[in-house]
Amino acid sequence: MPRTQKNDNFVDKSFTVMADIILKILPTNKKAKEAFVYYRDGMSAQAEGEYAEALEYYEEALTLEEDTNDRGYILYNMGLIYASNGDHDKALELYHQAIELNPRLPQALNNIAVIYHYKGEKAKEDGDHDGGEALFDQAADYWIRAIRMAPNNYIEAQNWLKTTGRMQIDVFF
């Protein structure tokens, strides 16, 4: 059963109705509309914590979606699910695929940096100081890229870059 038929949340239901109306009036092909329906249902399932269901919808959306930017967003959302479930390697793979298709996704760059930072912390805890620092350097590279795209975001990352000496003065110019 499509998620649109079993959603009891008024806001989600309203969004679904509006999205359906927009889909009907937009001059786009049937395949693109169907891809959006699966993507929308994936977002709805993800918001409800139904991650396995969300991944199924996203996988189906990927088979139908032709627009590279939209495919990037689908992969990004899939990465969010894997990251929240602790599968950081799979999340990294999906985030990298997302920015390959849609380089204007600072949120994916940020999430890559967060994972590298986390892995750096773990490496240091395990006694691998050099490995941890290398992972911190990777995190810094991705945060700098994200901040260049969205300079008013990622304030904590900006502070970390400054306090660790990983940000040059002209990084945003």
Curated annotation (Swiss-Prot):
Location (main, coarse): membrane
InterPro entries named in the record: PSI_Ycf3_assembly (IPR022818), TPR-like_helical_dom_sf (IPR011990), TPR_rpt (IPR019734), Ycf3/AcsC/BcsC/TPR_MFPF (IPR051685)
TPR repeat residue numbers: 35-68, 72-105, 120-153
Keyword Kinase set for record: no
Membrane topology: Peripheral membrane protein
UniProt cross-references to SMART domains, sorted A to Z: TPR
Gene3D superfamilies assigned to the protein according to its UniProt record, in alphabetical order: Tetratricopeptide repeat domain
A GO biological-process term: photosynthesis
Keyword Membrane appears in the UniProt entry: yes
Keywords, sorted A to Z: Membrane, Photosynthesis, Repeat, Thylakoid, TPR repeat
Source species, domain of life: Bacteria
Cellular component GO terms held in the UniProt record: plasma membrane-derived thylakoid membrane
Subcellular location(s) of the protein: Cellular thylakoid membrane
Pfam family, one: TPR_1
Leader sequence residues: none
Annotated PROSITE patterns: TPR, TPR_REGION
Family the UniProt entry places it in: Belongs to the Ycf3 family.
PANTHER family for this protein: CELLULOSE SYNTHASE OPERON PROTEIN C, TPR REPEAT-CONTAINING PROTEIN MJ0263
Protein role: Essential for the assembly of the photosystem I (PSI) complex. May act as a chaperone-like factor to guide the assembly of the PSI subunits.
Annotated protein name in UniProt: Photosystem I assembly protein Ycf3
Organism encoding this protein: Trichormus variabilis (strain ATCC 29413 / PCC 7937)
